[in-house]
Amino acid sequence: MYAILQKFLFTQDAEWSHDFTINWLKRTQHNFLNVAYKQHIDDKPVEFLGITFKNPVGLAAGLDKNAECIDAFAAMGFGFIEVGTVTPKAQAGNDKPRMFRLPAGQAIINRMGFNNKGVDYLVEQVKQAKYKGVLGINIGKNKTTPEDEALNDYLICLRKVYAHASYVTVNISSPNTPGLRNLQYGDALTQLLEGLKEEQANLEVKHNKRVPILIKIAPDLEDSELDSMVDSFLTVGIDGVIATNTTLDRDRVKGQEHAEEAGGLSGSVLTDKSQQIVSSLCTKLAGNVPVIGVGGIDSPHAAKARIEAGSPLIQVYSALIYQGPKLIKEIVDSL
């Protein structure tokens, strides 16, 4: 079924296809048409951050930005689902066109720019979902918010999503919001994390519930930059790390149509770079902070390699677009 749908969608503009798919999933997730993507996957539980995940394969943030299709992705058999990135206020994102396929490398370039309907809308969608599994909510800052006021945006989102999330991911690594990646380094990172951890403690008392905070990092990091980040993670006591976001590197797609488009590159061409960061990160953290691996996970082999590198949980996005829901089952069955 997916192969037929994909053949049609790949004749259309990439963002139009994305929007069509989200709307279709939204309309079918609660009726018999969900048979098109619903599948049974055996449980392979993983304990992580004190939470039981029914299997280690999750949906990465960015596909269901507004949490409109949670039950559809649950029907596909994901072990956990991450929605967002969401910002305090709704925003349109960057100018179109802003999403491009590079089929030769099963890759996608996007410069969406955190387009979303705002955190209040997302929370309402989460409340309406029937899903009772592990839900991550990925939060960001509005484009118009200055870097030195970024913490306020993250705190607004954290307070609003806290009661509804299994974990919260702080996105400081998208390349499509000007200045955002500057928050990954030095004092800026430490101050951001300290502010978030302080509010987490307040919210834990208020809601009588501890919700872990994870940081999503970029793959485009020098070893010294990664060392600095690890120091901040250990000093502040961050709960977990998601590695990695999309890359600005184009070495693996040179000469392909759309290769020089601005934005973050994801897909199979990211496999080696993300694998390297996860391996290095897990070595440096030495088990003190757990890691979720994402980026170019397009096969059972890639999934196993990421898990063996030290990330017991993994996420997929681009490979799901190219291969369909069967990929989830193939990975889980192989583990």
Curated annotation (Swiss-Prot):
InterPro entries: Aldolase_TIM, DHO_dehydrogenase, Dihydroorotate_DH_1_2, Dihydroorotate_DH_2, Dihydroorotate_DH_cat, Dihydroorotate_DH_CS. FMN binds at residues 61-65, 85, 138, 171, 216, 244, 267, 296, 317-318. Its EC number is 1.3.5.2. CDD domains: DHOD_2_like. Catalyzes the conversion of dihydroorotate to orotate with quinone as electron acceptor. HAMAP family: DHO_dh_type2. This is Dihydroorotate dehydrogenase (quinone). It comes from Pseudoalteromonas atlantica (strain T6c / ATCC BAA-1087). The lineage of its organism: Bacteria, Pseudomonadati, Pseudomonadota, Gammaproteobacteria, Alteromonadales. The gene is pyrD.
